[in-house]
A protein has these predicted regions:
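Short C-terminal tail/terminal secondary-structure segment
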Residues: 19, 244-245, 256-269
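Conserved glycine-rich Rossmann-like NAD(P)H-binding loop of the short-chain dehydrogenase/reductase
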Residues: 30-46
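Catalytic loop of short-chain dehydrogenase/reductase
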Residues: 140-166, 171-180, 192-193
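Alpha-helical segment proximal to the catalytic Tyr-Lys
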Residues: 129, 176-177, 253
Length: 269
């Protein structure tokens, strides 16, 4: 299958680890010149070395906090300086808050929207004019399964779910609006992906809730025994990266405005 990605350029947010890192690696293998953005410079440096080691491709990096509007404003200049043009945008940065509805703080609610939906909206708004000016482009917004289904404890998502749903709806609206400009927009919705960062995040959430040692141990047993996932297995970042690469390739030229769910049939609806 010819993907037609050689010599294209791409920006991947949240690209220093997990799905973002593997997406940057997979794009680099296809001959794409990749710019990876994430918050921590040390993590970006590690990602660049890792991708160079496995692909012999040099990637560009730039620190970026997608919750800071003033930093998002600099993206067009960064792209021009480091890539020259922008063919592909992968909006991967995001996170989740998993706690009971009545325990979610207003700060967590605002942060959840800012790092997920607001960031994707704002970044697209800065990059789309560049794509229109150059004649087209491809965008993938990465959402999550809490945007399409309600999960079992401990994966409580009253805060994260609405933000992820907004990303999905935004992708569909944008696909329709930008189709006349030769810009395709799709939304990739991963299921449970097994990364060290996911479990570290849940540990931080547990610490915030100040559970008893017994209750904390009970919640950890749900993670490790897969009871929260029921009859399906955990996916890998590489599997989601492969889907993203396909979605931005010439092989997916008729796929636009799609919800691309990769969850091993976890969602039975």
């Amino acid at each position: 299958m010819e993907l037609g990605l050689a010599n294209k350029t791409a920006l991947v947010t949240g690209g220093s680890k997990g799905i973002g890192l593997e997406t940057a690696r997979a794009l680099a293998r296809e001959g794409v010149k990749v710019l990876v953005c994430a918050r921590r410079e040390s993590a970006l440096a590690d990602a660049a070395r890792d991708i160079m080691r496995t692909t012999q491709a040099k990637i560009e990096v730039h620190p970026l906090d997608v919750t800071k509007v003033e930093q998002i404003e600099t993206i067009p200049r960064i792209i021009t300086d480091k890539l020259g043009r922008i063919d592909i945008l992968v909006n991967n940065a995001g996170t989740g808050t998993y706690k009971p509805f009545l325990e979610v703080t207003d700060e967590e609610l605002v942060e959840g929207m800012a790092i997920n939906f607001f960031a994707q909206f704002r970044i697209c708004q800065r990059i789309v004019p560049m794509m229109i000016a150059q004649g087209g482009g491809r965008i993938v917004n990465v959402s999550g399964q809490t945007g399409i289904m309600t999960l079992n404890p401990p994966f409580l998502s009253s805060c994260t779910g609405p933000a992820k749903s907004a990303e999905i709806r935004f992708s569909k609206v944008l696909a329709n609006e930008l189709a006349p400009h030769n810009i395709r927009v799709n939304c990739v919705i991963p299921g449970f992906i097994n990364t060290p960062e996911r479990f570290a995040k849940w540990e931080r959430e547990l610490a915030k809730r100040q559970l008893s040692p017994e209750d904390a141990a009970r919640e950890r047993s749900l993670w490790s025994s897969n009871q929260g996932v029921r009859d399906t297995r955990w996916g890998t970042p590489e599997e989601i990266a492969n889907l993203i690469v396909f979605a931005v390739s010439d092989a997916a030229s008729y796929i636009n405005g799609a919800e691309l769910v990769a969850d091993n049939a976890m969602d039975k609806s």
